[in-house]
Amino acid sequence: MIQIILGVIIVSIGIFVFYKYPMKSDVRQMTLGALFVILAIILKRLAVMVPFLGFPSLKITLEVLPLIVAGLTLQPGYCFIVSIATDFLGLVLANAGGFPFLGFTLNAVLQTEIPCLLKIYLNEKNERLLERIVKIVMVIISLLGCLYVFKINEVNISGSMYQVTLPIKFTIFVIIAAMLTILFIFIRYYKNKLKEKDLHLFHLSILSVVAIELTVTMFLTPYWLQTMYGIPFFASQFVRILKSCVMIPVGIIIVYTMNRMIQKVIR
C-alpha cells in the first residue's frame, strides 16, 4: 500500500512540474543534467561506513550535493528527470534485486525539486527572514544533539551496545560547538564579502542544504527505514543529529562553490 501511495505522490509531483514549468529543449541543460547524474552516481558508489568515536555506523556520502546543485541550476523538468535517472541507475549499478522502494526515489526527487522551487520563488526579503530561521534551527538542532548525548549512557548500533562515556560526550559537545561556530563565521564572512547576485546564490545554497537535511535526512529516511525494516524512528536520530551538525556546514560550502563555478561557466 505504501508503494502505491509513494508512486502516486511521485507521479503527481512530475505532473505538476511538467504542467507548471513546461520543458524547453536546451542542450546545455541536458549536458549539465547528464553530468549531475554521473557525479551523483559516482559519489554514491564511493559512500563509505566509517567509525565515529568508536561507533562503526556513520555513512559518509556526498551524493546528495550534486542533486542540490542540479536543483539550483536546471529547470524543474530537467531536475525531475535527473533525480529519477540517478535513483534508477544507482539501483541498476548496485545490482539490487526486486522492486525498488519508492521512498528513496521520492527522496531523490525532493533533493532536486526543493532547491529548484526555492530558486524560483525566493525573493530578497524572504531570504533574510529564512536565513534567521535557519540559524535558529541550527542552534536548536545542536542543542537537541547535546541534550540527547548528555542523557544517554549507551547506544545500540548495528546490533551492538556502546557505552557513551563522559570523555566521548565532551568530545561530541566540542565537535557540535565547533561546527556551529564555523558555520556562523562562514556565513558572516561571505555576507560581507559577496556582491548582491553572489549573495543570493549563497543564501539559496544555505537554505537548500538545510531544507534537504531536515526533510530527507532527519525525517523521511528514518521513516522509510522504519517502514521497511521495523527500525524505530528515533533509533538512528543520535547519529543523524551529529552527522547533520557536521554535514550541513560542509554541504553549504561545497554546494555554493560548485554552483558558483557552474554559473561562471554558463554565463
What residue spans do the PLM features occupy?
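Loop-helix junctions at membrane interfaces
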Residues: 1-267
